[in-house]
Amino acid sequence: MTLTTQFYTMLAMSGMGLWLGASLDTYRLFVIRAKTARWLLFIHDILFWIMQGLLFFYVLLHVNEGEFRIYIFLAVLLGVATYQSLCKRIYIKILKFVIYLVVSVYQFFKKLIQHVLFRPIVWTCGAIIWLAAFLFKKTYSLIGFLLLCLYKIVMVLCFPIRFIAKQCLKLLPVKMRLTFRRYFEKGAGFLKKKKKLLITIRTTITRFLKR
């Protein structure tokens, strides 16, 4: 190994020492050890050191073809010590500012999307539902009114027929009148049941529309 290669190796490993110090502070800032489960923290630590080891070996492979020397560890310690004494405070301040800036930008765009996209969609859907319920209620009321008018018209038109039918029934024998009365009572009971069902459905729909 030539002196030039050794010099580049020392320089690269010192830089990697600076990188290691900054990486440790970044890792500690993002991973809150007191609030993280032990098994998850163990996995994080293992992955962190594996990534650091692979990165160190990659740099060393490009600088001196992956040869290990004692001075390499000394250069790494020198880089870490330099970071701790000169760069740590500045780096942490810059890192916290960048995190604050990223979070602020994220919150801004989140609120912007909520106000510009989501709320108008919610308001539009609410207006459509209200309009559909209003139209359904008015249509239901109109149909009920028309059916009531039709019922009254039919009753008025059928009044002569009913009157004639009653008079004809009076002329029939008693047994036949009783038979007709039973059939009429059964029909009236059936109609009452259907009427109660229609009233129940109408009440349910009216309560739903009033909400």
UniProtKB/Swiss-Prot annotation:
Induction: Expression is sigma E-dependent and negatively regulated by spo0A. It is found in: Forespore outer membrane. GO terms for biological process: sporulation resulting in formation of a cellular spore. The chain crosses the membrane at residues 7-27, 40-60, 66-86, 90-110, 116-136, 141-161. GO terms for cellular component: endospore-forming forespore; membrane. Its main location: membrane. Keywords: Membrane, Sporulation, Transmembrane, Transmembrane helix. It comes from the Bacteria. It is a multi-pass membrane protein. The keyword rRNA processing does not apply. Required for sporulation. Plays an important role in cortex and coat formation. This is Spore protein YabQ. It comes from Bacillus subtilis (strain 168). The lineage of its organism: Bacteria, Bacillati, Bacillota, Bacilli, Bacillales.
